[in-house]
Regions:
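Intrinsically disordered, low-complexity boundary segments flanking structured domains
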Residues: 24-25, 51-56, 79-81
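Short, intrinsically disordered low-complexity segments
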Residues: 33-71
Length: 95
């Protein structure tokens, strides 16, 4: 399943640390497409782990998370224009 994750973490007492932890959790499951936006292709078990980790990291009184579920037919729903074209997460990858 394809999920777009966006977040806004307040930079105050402990905010910078929370921001780094949220970004790291997202990087483990997807690719950054903007500063606080990640495209993640995950199975249901991975999604549960990622979502739980993100919710645990934020301060719900100061920070916010948004999850956009684009499903398995996401290629028809995503259009990219401009620089920084992303990598195909489902295609072959040479490391």
């Amino acid at each position: 399943m394809f999920v777009l994750v966006s977040y806004d973490v307040a930079i105050d007492d402990g905010g910078a640390k929370r921001l780094r932890r949220v970004a790291k959790a997202c990087r483990n499951y997807g690719q950054r497409v903007q500063y606080s936006v990640f495209e993640c292709i995950v199975d249901p078990a991975q999604w549960t782990v990622l979502r739980d980790n993100l919710i645990r990291e934020i301060d719900e009184g100061k920070d916010s998370l948004r999850f956009y579920y684009l499903g398995s037919n996401w290629r028809r729903r995503v259009e990219h224009v401009g620089a920084k074209k992303g990598i195909d997460q489902e295609g072959p990858m040479i490391v």
